[in-house]
Structure formats: C-alpha cells, structure tokens
C-alpha cells in the first residue's frame, strides 16, 4: 500500500499517494502507479518534464477529493498515461452520481490572478507553485502529452487547456516561436456525461488524436481564440459535437500603409506588431478588422470610428412563434431588421416558415446581409401584427489571413485575405488582428449527437433522436472546417455538401451552386 513517510525511490519503499510522490519528483522522473484506486487531495501539481504512468488503463483509477478542482496540473514536457479518472464508487453506479463542475482531469497551473479571482485553484499537493507554465531552462516548449486514459468524471472537462496559464516567459521575456500554449493527446476517451471532452480557450492550441467523447455536453470546445487539429476521433450522443465560438483578444496591431481601393483581397500594413511591440508576421488562423472612420464614406449617415468588427446576421431564433391563427401559411409574414449602416452594406433577406396552426416555426436566412455596425439595433420585426417574438444571432465580419509577407524593419507586411474587402480603406487606418476559435478535423465520426447526455435515454433503442445541426456549431466568428460521417453513413464536407448514402443522393448549398454554374442555357438546349 505504501506510506507517504517512505522515500518513494524504491518499489518496496513507495509513497501511498500520487500527491506525495509528485512533491519529490524532479524533471525527468517517472511516477509509477501500481493497480488500485487512489483517492487524492487535488489539484496535484507536477514539475516540468515529470511523467505519471499507471500500470494499465483499467487497473489504475484516480478519484479527486475536491470535485470542483482540477486533478493534475501539468507543465512543459509532462506525460500522463494509463489512468482512469472517476468519481467515488460508493454510489452503486460507478461514481457517475457525483458531479465535477469545472474539474479538469488535466490542466495547466492557473495564474495568481485567476486564483485570487476564484476562477481556478492552486495545486495543494505535489509541486504547488503557481502558474503559468513555461518552457523551463531548456528554452524550448514541449507540449504536455496525455495518452491512453479514460475520464469517467460526470460534468468534468477531460483536457482543460487555458492559454492564459501557459507562456514561454521563463527568462523574463517571451521567447518567440516557443509561445505555443499547447497540449497533445493520443487516445483519451471522454465518458464524462454532461461535461466537456476538451476545452481550449485564450489562444490555446492542441493536436488531438483518437479523442472519443460519449454523452458530453460539448465534445470539443474552442472559445476565445482556442484552436485545435482533431484526427481519427468520434463524438457519440451528448448535446453538441464540435463547437467553435468567438474570437480571441487582440494579438497584433498596425496601420494601413497606402490608400486601398474597394474589392481588393490584399493590403499593406505598416508597424504590424504584437502587444510587446515586436514586429510580427500575420498568419493563417487570424482575422483582421479595420477601425475605419465612417465619415470617410458617402453611403452611410453614421459617424465615428469603429472599435469592433462590423457584423452579419447568422440566424433568426424563434423565441415565441405567436398564437394559433396569428399568421397565414399561404402568405407568410415579412421578417425584417433595421438596415445595416456600414459602408457598402447589403440588406439581409429572410423567409418565415408558418405551421398549419398559424404559428411561426422557423426563419430561413436567404441572405445574411453585410456591414451592420457593432452597436446597431437588431430588433426583428414581423409584419401582420401577430404575437411572435424573434431574435437575431450575429457574427463579426473578419478578413481571415491566407498568407502574409515577412515584416520589414519598419513592420511593413502585405496580407492576402481569403475574402475581398468591399469598401475602400484609407492610409493610416488602424487595424487589429485576432485569433479565430477554430477546430480543423477530417473523417470525424458523429453518432446520435443532440440526443442528450443521459446515456440511458440517448441511445436509439430508448428513443434517442439525433439533431444533425448540433454536430458542428461555429458561431461568433468561430470556424470548423471538417469532413464527417454520421450514424447513417452520410458523408459531409463542411456545411455545404452532404453525400446521403441512404438515398444515394448529393445535396447541399455548395452542390446546388455548382450545378447551377454548369447547367447553362446552351447545355439545356443541347439536351
């Protein structure tokens, strides 16, 4: 059984708890855990380059005493492998009755500011120094590595990767190129009902292989600039599969170098630098917006300088469809919002779907519009005087970086975007570059996503019903480029193309556009 008064350096003189072993483990050491269930006073902190290795995946179980706190705090070069994470087994249900809100099985050590704010908690056993993690004396970041583990902690987060808790500032200044804020993973099963499989925030990054999420609230979540590459993975049951939400804080700033005409997809930016004043090259995964002065444009009556991106309308939510008989299915009401007030604006178009009972069930967005001002009203109006209440969802308009040139000694770089800039931009206009929350995945498997987090009700033979729209959610500027297969074998390439194997058909927005482009009047006449 071991004893925490033992030296811990020999198997016959082993420590009893992982926390005690972690307190003496130095860089390069491996904590070997023999089979058993270990109830630990957590968080357990690890020094740089310390490994924790269980005897086998099904033989070693970690049970945290503090269910609202992280289990392991890892740093540069740490390895966690061959472990189970679980709630106490005294509920007769394998520990699933115990909730673990905000508990990360593996996380970076929080900063003092986060601890003071009560957002996260400092390690109480093992290496208890406060975060953030850094690259250590090596001067080179090596991502913590999680391999061959299973998370059974209900409501928990398997990998909680907060970029604010990791940087490359070991010597007093950030070592460029090492500021990766990253973890890597191979084979980490998330059977944490109503939890999150992997959470990435604040410009964190991860490379994830063989992540299997089961009955989670969100399988993989990227927010505030978190990004990941996801390979050979699966999301089964639960509420949401993959979700990218929002953009991060400002990374780079600069000024437009020369007057640039409308409909250009590249622009020269001078003095392009990060928050510490160092000239930087913009990169794929960032989005830019211009702090234009509205007085420079003749097609808007608005004034002032923009400090946030302009917007488009992503969708219209039906809060209340109205009373029976309010609307006519044969003549649906008009749905409108105030016109966008930015330069080169486009008015959105919507189509209401009305049930036989005369209530609004949903709204189709025919055109998202363009260049709504950040502080503009998005009140949704419905003609006909019924009682429906609708609400607009918006996304920021960012010009995403395709390529950029190396900055000169004055920070001058030319950025080419994936989109065209619809309006002119004058020299001297300030710009901001922000990290996009993004999940990139190929061949992802979805099964019954949207059926809920109770596995006893979400499976199909208990009546579980999947919601296809919940497989991938990209909102508020987030992106999820993906290919996937669902429980029916239907193959999707992003949001625009579906290969339906049940009906042997191809459908989707992008397919329809391609067909329309090919079926010219001449082709139709020849046929």
Set out the residue ranges of the language-model regions.
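Right-handed parallel beta-helix/beta-solenoid
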Residues: 1-20, 37, 55-56, 508
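Short, T/G/N/S-enriched strand-turn elements that build extracellular solenoid repeat scaffolds
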Residues: 18-26, 39-47, 52, 70-74, ...
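Extracellular beta-strand-rich solenoid/capping regions of secreted or surface-exposed proteins
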Residues: 19, 23-27, 39-53, 60-82, ...
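All-beta strand scaffolds that present successive hydrophobic residues in beta-strands
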Residues: 33, 51-54, 79-82, 116, ...
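Feature marks extracellular polysaccharide-active and adherence modules
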Residues: 34, 41, 47, 53-55, ...
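Conserved, function-critical positions that sit in or immediately flank catalytic
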Residues: 255-446, 450, 454-456, 467-469
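Extracellular "spike/adhesin" assembly and maturation modules
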Residues: 456-527
